[in-house]
Each structure stands twice: as structure tokens, then as C-alpha cells.
Amino acid sequence: MTKYIFVTGGVVSSLGKGITAASLGRLLKNRGMDVTIQKFDPYINVDPGTMSPYQHGEVFVTDDGAETDLDLGHYERFIDINLNKYSNVTTGKIYSTVLKKERRGDYLGGTVQVIPHITNEIKDRVYRAGKETGADVVITEIGGTVGDIESLPFLEAIRQMKSDIGRENVMYIHCTLVPYIRAAGELKTKPTQHSVKELRSLGIQPNVIVVRTEMPMTQDMKDKIALFCDIDTKAVIECQDADTLYSIPLDLQKQGLDKLVCEHMKLDCQDADMTEWTALVDKVQNLSKQVTIGLVGKYVELQDAYISVVESLRHAGYAFDADVQIKWINAEEVTAENMADFAQDVDGIIVPGGFGDRGVEGKIIATQYARENKVPFFGICLGMQVASIEYARNVLGLEGAHSAEIDPETAFPIIDLLPEQKDVDDLGGTLRLGLYPCKLNEDSKAFAAYNDEVVYERHRHRYEFNNEFRQQMEAAGFVFSGTSPDGRLVEIIELKDHPWFLASQFHPEFVSRPTRPQPLFRDFVGASLQASESK
């Protein structure tokens, strides 16, 4: 029978519930378990696809085209699995489904209520994650903090599951904070005690408490938490701030978290072989080289907006024994006069995705600088579009060339709306989303990176290169090195007379892994490192 583990949070948000859940998933997978994982978000939006990155951070796209929470990126990178639309559930999705059923008459005229209709729908999403994947263990992170009004239906649903399928098949892990009061020089356990008290008032007794702290805890403190929270002392797991996220699974293993799970759920499984992971962490903590990448974006104040891009750059660095340093460059502040100052200490420039006109001209200027000064350049999604616009303006001389998204009146719409998008009115869930094939030209940097004729990458866009300008651009030296198999959609562009200048319409950052860097990121960082060493 499938086992279900629920990870909740207390005291404050952003405690690292997602990293805890992902780390546990890695440990159980290395014990031979088939693991899947999901995130429940209490907000009323159907998905984060139309939310501002300032509100939510990155939107992570799955193979099947679901627009999801950034924690799914952590899950995929840690556990090395590809998730799907069942892996991210919001209050908006739950209520939308229940209301559709009510309109169809599925409830036979009954009064639709939070209990049982909403809670039953929540439980169905948990069970479906296990059924669709055939997993031995389903790990579910409950977003938000215990005590939030929005989280109550989710907590009630997972409380009911203990009675529905048996205590030995359900486990609750509660993540809390033990703050360090610098003026007193003390760690305080009282917030954890109150958080667990709140959780217990809702009918959930945690089996394990994972304590986030910036200072080491004493055994007396663990004993105190165990006493007041009614759990075994060995079930109080300390999680100190770490130099690298990838060391967390090893820290949790040392304290026996995976063993506690296996004992509680009566899982007969082997010990976790973490040899490869230990080697990864050892490499990450002892990198001998350094390379600096300038990231030109419009959301740089909130770095979580680019979290998969940053992690992919770091993964690529590991392949070269290099620590990748990110220089955050606000695209709105970039001008033709100051771009050289911004680029003075960078070895490569990356322009990631984004929507809207804010900062676009700064990105175009940064792209021009990289092209003219032979600085390794990597554009992603909007980054490919601005690279195309820049080339049209400054090489072909098409003054005012732009994207129809930014300037609908431009005489030279180098980037235009996809034909299938012209009659679409809704914003949410209507982009070209998910995994699509890309056919590569053999004589190209893209082919050299992948060493394959056809590759599959994840997409999230509504606009595409306008084929009316393709022949003209190609004649001027612009290389279309990757297209859809039918040749209709441009997927990758590059320049031949440049050390490394490449941009993709798709989002390669969504498939990178710490032990298996994405090929384009790998070669971009490699070219940047080479540029650094030749200075």
C-alpha cells in the first residue's frame, strides 16, 4: 500500500519545508523506494502562471505543461524525477473542480460544504498522485504556516487520512523555527512549542519535528522540545543553516530522519547509499576555480524569480570544478553608456525569460554588448527574442525592429504572436507550455552541446520568431540552429563568428540536475570560464 508523508510548517514561512521534503525524497529514493512528491498551495489562484514573480518567485514548468510552484524545481533537482500536473494543487484548483461538479449536478442537490466536499477533493488529489505514478511513498508539502485561515481545509483533509487509511500509512513532519536572540545569546524553543500546540489543536500530532536554527542546539533543548511536544527525543531533527542546499540530505540522514520514517511506516527497505551524493557535496564545498556570470533581468530584487537559472549555472560550474558567482544586473538600469561598467568584471552574460516591456531595452543593449565584444552570451525565451531584435536593428539596419508584444505598431515585428494564440483571450494556462521536440543542425554549437539530432525541452511562451524575416536574417549571418521538427518554429539561434553566442526559445533551466548539468548551460559556463582564464 502507498504510504503518505505530510510536511507542514510553523512559526514563520520560508523555513525550508520544500528542501526538507525534497531531501527526504532523495533519502527514500536511495533506499530503493519509488517516490513522488507534491505541493499544496493555499492561495486562491488556480496556478502561479499569471502571478507576478515579485509575489511568487519563479514559475516552474513540468513536462506536461503545468505552471507550478518553484518548490517543484527543488523536488526535481534533489530527487531526479520528472513531475506532472498532479504535483501542484492550489485552493483555486480545488474550489474550481468542486464548483464544476456542483454545476453538473454531481452532488445531487446536496449542500456543498468545506467538509466533506472540499476536504474530499483535497484527499482525492493526494491519492491521485500515488495512483498516477504507482509510487511507494507520496510526500506532500502543505504551503503556508499552521494557523493560517487558508490552510485549514488542507490540514483537516490530511488529519482525516490518518483514520481513513491507518496510522501506519500516514506520517506528519512539522518544520519549525528556533530563533536565536542575539541580545540574550540564547535559542528559544517557545515558538516551536506554540506551533505544535496549534497543530495539535487541529487534530494532528507530528511524528517528527524538524527544527530550523542558525546556531547549534544542545541536547537539553531537544529534550525540552520532545517533552512539551509529546514526541521521542530522536524525532527532534536539527537543521542548521548550510553552505549548500545539497548537504541537507546528508545532515538529515546522519540524524536518522529516513530511518524514523521507515520504522513508523514499517517499510522494509535497504539503507540509503549516498555515495554519489556525498561526492557531489564534497565537490561543491571544494571548488578550485571561479567564474562570474552577469545575469541581466527585470526581477533581480527577488532572486527566487530566477532560481532554476541560478541552480543550472551552478550545476554547470560543478562540471568544471568552478564556483559560479552571479552578478545581478537590473535591466532597467542598463544604458549604452554604462553597460561596459556593468560588464567589467563578468566572464559571460545571460539574459533569462520575462514578460512585458519593462527592462527590454536594457536587455537589448546587454545583448549588443556581448555580441560586439565577444563575451559569451546565453539567452533564454525573451533572451532569444531580444537577441533576434538586436541583430535585426544593429546588423540588418531595421530601425525600430521589435516584438509585437512590446510594440504592436512596429514596422518590423521580428517577434510575433504564435498563430494558434491569435484567438486566445484568457491569460492563465494558455501559453505554449511543456515538453516539445527540437531538431538541431549538425554544424552548430547546439548540436555540439547535446550531441543529438532531436532533443526535448520545456517551453513557456506566447510569442515566437517571425519567419517573414528568417531568410533576411540568415543571409546576414544569423544562424537558426534548432527548430521544431517541421521547421516552422525557431527554437535556437546562434552566431558563428563569436566564441559562444546562443539563445533558446525554450527553458533549459527546468531540466538541469546537480549531478547532470543541462548541456547548453554546461557549454555556456565552459566558454565563460575559458574567457576568464584568457583575460
Swiss-Prot record:
In which domain of life is the source organism classified?
Bacteria
How is this protein annotated for GO cellular component? Answer: cytosol
- Activity control note: Allosterically activated by GTP, when glutamine is the substrate; GTP has no effect on the reaction when ammonia is the substrate. The allosteric effector GTP functions by stabilizing the protein conformation that binds the tetrahedral intermediate(s) formed during glutamine hydrolysis. Inhibited by the product CTP, via allosteric rather than competitive inhibition.
Family annotation (HAMAP family) = PyrG
Q: Quaternary form?
A: Homotetramer.
What terms describe the molecular function in GO for this protein?
A: ATP binding; CTP synthase activity; glutaminase activity; identical protein binding; metal ion binding
Which residues does UniProt mark as catalytic? C381 (nucleophile), H507, E509
Q: Name the residues that bind UTP.
A: S13, K188, T189, K190, P191, T192, Q193, K224
Q: Which InterPro entries match?
A: Class_I_gatase-like, CTP_synthase, CTP_synthase_N, GATASE, GATase1_CTP_Synthase, P-loop_NTPase
PROSITE patterns documented for this protein:
GATASE_TYPE_1
Q: Where does L-glutamine bind?
A: Y54, G354, L382, G383, M384, Q385, E405, R462
Family under the similarity heading: Belongs to the CTP synthase family.
- Residues that coordinate or bind Mg(2+): D71, E141
What is the stated purpose of this protein? Catalyzes the ATP-dependent amination of UTP to CTP with either L-glutamine or ammonia as the source of nitrogen. Regulates intracellular CTP levels through interactions with the four ribonucleotide triphosphates.
Leader sequence residues = none
Every copy of the Glutamine amidotransferase type-1 domain together lies at 292-534
For the region Amidoligase domain, what residue ranges are annotated?
1-267
Where does this protein act, in terms of pathway? Pyrimidine metabolism; CTP biosynthesis via de novo pathway; CTP from UDP: step 2/2
The entry marks the following residues as binding ATP, namely S14, L15, G16, K17, G18, I19, D71
Keyword Magnesium applies: yes
Q: What is its EC number?
A: 6.3.4.2
Output the GO biological process annotations, alphabetical, semicolon-separated: 'de novo' CTP biosynthetic process; pyrimidine nucleobase biosynthetic process
Classification of source organism: Bacteria, Bacillati, Bacillota, Bacilli, Bacillales
Q: Which reaction does it catalyse?
A: UTP + L-glutamine + ATP + H2O = CTP + L-glutamate + ADP + phosphate + 2 H(+); L-glutamine + H2O = L-glutamate + NH4(+); UTP + NH4(+) + ATP = CTP + ADP + phosphate + 2 H(+)
- Name of the molecule in the record: CTP synthase
